[in-house]
């Protein structure tokens, strides 16, 4: 083995050890591979379901103006969402797609096929925006936004 080959192998091994040592609170990469911080990716294809926040128990809700928030369960279609399998999450009442931006705002817009409207679902409850890599988050006031994954229950959501 020549010196260049040894240096290349050493550099790759060293780089790999730095990548493996990244803290779990680091911002998630916006790709479709499983991340130790996010868990295993699961199917985003589902019929009309509710999306419940693990910490607050409130349901993801929306309106025709595009506002997104959480409310206690009320049985309405504004609290129901569909996942047709293309990565979008659509409000059952309005037909609009869940959308976000790099500032962390979450809202709905008419579906346009863009990556800001694509979401990845993970086995431990994270819902990650494909474009920004940030995950859906909430609080007891009903606000909904995205932040880098931090392991908290406000960032975990369950369909039902």
Swiss-Prot record:
Q: Which domain of life does this protein belong to? A: Bacteria
Q: In the UniProt record, does the keyword Signal occur? A: yes
Where does the record place the Ricin B-type lectin domain?
A: 45-160
3 X 38 AA tandem repeats as annotated region, ranges: 47-160
Q: Where is the signal peptide?
A: 1-26
What keywords does the record list, in alphabetical order? Antiviral protein, Lectin, Repeat, Signal
Task: List the molecular function annotations (GO) for this entry.
Answer: carbohydrate binding
SMART domains this protein is in? RICIN
Entry's Gene Ontology BP terms: regulation of defense response to virus
Where do the sequence repeat units fall?
A: 47-84, 85-122, 123-160
**Residue positions assigned to the propeptide:** 27-46
Q: What InterPro entries would the database entry show?
A: Ricin_B-like_lectins, Ricin_B_lectin
Q: Describe its partners and assembly state.
A: Interacts with HIV gp120 and SIV gp130.
What does the further note read?
Answer: Anti-HIV protein that inhibits virus membrane fusion.
Its recorded name reads: Actinohivin
Q: Which organism is it from?
A: Actinomycete sp. (strain K97-0003)
């Amino acid at each position: 083995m020549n010196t260049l080959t040894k240096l290349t192998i050493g550099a790759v091994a060293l780089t790999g050890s730095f990548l493996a040592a990244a803290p779990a609170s680091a911002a998630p990469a916006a790709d479709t591979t499983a991340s130790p911080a996010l868990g295993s990716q699961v199917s985003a294809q589902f019929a009309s379901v509710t999306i419940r926040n693990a910490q607050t128990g409130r349901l993801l809700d929306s309106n025709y103006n595009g506002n997104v928030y959480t409310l206690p369960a009320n049985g309405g279609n504004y609290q129901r969402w569909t996942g047709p399998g293309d990565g979008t999450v659509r409000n059952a009442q309005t037909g609009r797609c869940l959308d976000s931006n790099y500032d962390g705002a979450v809202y709905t817009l008419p579906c346009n096929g863009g990556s800001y409207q694509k979401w990845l679902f993970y086995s431990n409850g994270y819902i990650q925006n494909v474009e920004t890599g940030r995950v859906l988050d909430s609080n007891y006031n009903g606000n909904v936004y995205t932040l880098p994954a931090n392991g908290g229950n406000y960032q975990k959501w369950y369909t039902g």
